[in-house]
Amino acid sequence: ADEFISRCRDFSRLLKEYHPNAEMWPSAQQPHSIPNWGEKLISELQELPDEIDGIITGPNHAFEMDELRRRVPAKYPIRFYPDITHNVRCEYPVHFDRDDWHYALAAGLSRECTNPRPCEYREIHRLTRRYVVGSVSYSEGITDDVNKCVWSDMDFFPDVDVRDSLE
């Protein structure tokens, strides 16, 4: 994480020479091969480098959202990069709040089939939005259009009714 933040800082300085209003938002996603990466990232951010403008978090995160917000200095806003595409082996598996997908469907349809989950993603958005300053939802194409529509609508209108988003 120290080398990662160092490179982000160097790149940020160079970038701002040509684009003074550009911002640097490194990702807090943890590489699987570095178990203590999250702790090192927090340690680097404790130094409050001015070249860093905010943090992004998403799948493979080092910390749960509430813990990340507690540990990252308040100077840095957090933007969310949620995975609204995948059904299994992902950030929010289909059984996020209940075990409701039959094994045959999970095994047969797998990770990337069409599976609109507007009510579930509305609930996830409500649970996470207090920790972040917005989001850019992860999408892999047409299998998640409904989820993307609902999530994006809630970024702008947090209290919108799901039915209104879908209409």
Show which residues each predicted segment covers.
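Catalytic-core regions of glycoside hydrolase
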Residues: A1-E167
